From Swiss-Prot:
Its EC number is 7.1.2.2. The gene is atpD. Produces ATP from ADP in the presence of a proton gradient across the membrane. The catalytic sites are hosted primarily by the beta subunits. This is ATP synthase subunit beta. GO terms for cellular component: plasma membrane; proton-transporting ATP synthase complex. It comes from Cytophaga hutchinsonii (strain ATCC 33406 / DSM 1761 / CIP 103989 / NBRC 15051 / NCIMB 9469 / D465).
Amino acid sequence: MANIGKITQIIGPVVDVGFEGEYALPQILDALEVTRPDGQKVILECQQHLGEDRVRTIAMDSTDGLTRGMEVKTYGMPISMPVGEDIRGRLYNVVGDAIDGIPSGVAANRMSIHRQAPKFEDLSTNTEVLFTGIKVIDLLEPYVKGGKIGLFGGAGVGKTVLIMELINNIAKAYAGLSVFAGVGERTREGNDLLREMIESNVIRYGDEFKHSMEKGEWDLSKVDATELLKSQATLVFGQMNEPPGARARVALAGLTVAEYFRDGDGQGQGRDILFFIDNIFRFTQAGSEVSALLGRMPSAVGYQPTLATEMGAMQERITSTKRGSITSVQAVYVPADDLTDPAPATTFAHLDATTVLNRKISELGIYPAVDPLDSTSRILSPEILGSEHYDCAQRVKEILQRYKELQDIIAILGMDELSEEDKQAVHRARRVQRFLSQPFHVAEQFTGLKGELVNIKDTIKGFNMIMDGALDHLPEAAFNLVGSIEQAIAKGEKLVADSKK
């Protein structure tokens, strides 16, 4: 039987609810429900017990239309997400309501979004490389299967494009399931992602729907329910226009779905899951927005004092167990390009590999704008990757570091003042830097270049050829936005031939 309380105060997304009699108080993190005058339900989450039989809650939806004195029901349980095979291909919000417009029945099973991290003895410790087909990542900061990967970058340097390309390369090439949590990012990007996934058959709406989509229609009556169950992805969204309560919880909602797929439903073996979060910074930002309203003293740069605790509680759940694995790729917005900001700095500690995107590299027209010297990986070692891969990666880093050191001298005195050896290092480093770029499948419509996936053996061969001086006769432009070294050679020879005409 639900207990009934009444709203006593509303301050933006924070709602105070009074109950009569101390036994009626909901527990911390329990869900409460209030109905707006238009019949829409708003879910609240209990955050604090204030004394005098009052609790302070955060709303998961807009509090417009709520007034003091409105009745609030308690559920006696936290916010939960629907689970089961029929959630494949579906689009949910933070409280587990389908928002894709496709009719659905009531979910038989639901799981609380607040759960304990797996016990230490249940964790898996295997180390396996996850190749992505992106040269700069596979060579210099290889990803770990079942590990945590962070994509760091300021505004507009290409985090979302890179995450979309990773979904394209890994989710398509790999038959497993993907879960995407859109946390406080642009609604347009969520729409683009859904369309991209339908076109590439990661989410299956059926041929009839795809034909109608090609004509510019969006007729959900044509969705094939049996095809939908064969989808390989589930999406959970709480976008920029949502209140902070939803943005602070949607990452946990997506993670709950990923955990369900990883562990199975108790009927046998779990699975290997890909879990994408775009953007983990918004999770922190939402927490800081409500922190002051909840009466907490702000800490460094105005963030909530519980920043490390909240981040740790979530990141510890993203892990691989003996039943299945979660490989997570998290985009991390870096405010004002400052990696020492508490939000990105707290995230760093939890990751196995970091891919740092640099605005200076994007200004050179090199995409993906990955900083090869700032990016790291726990598994960049000869024991795991083999000595050929490791030696090539170290040579690339060495030549780029030398180029970086010489840039000040070049800026002041010019190239002519360098020794012959340094001139040669600079020429090769510039070719290496350009060869780290590559055209993406998801950017074909913008670049006009066909997307490329590059095998790691071809990547190593290409960089070794450049550093050994075998391609010194080709112009630098030949190495920009190409896939394999053969394409660069063909492009270079064409440029040389054209210049002689």
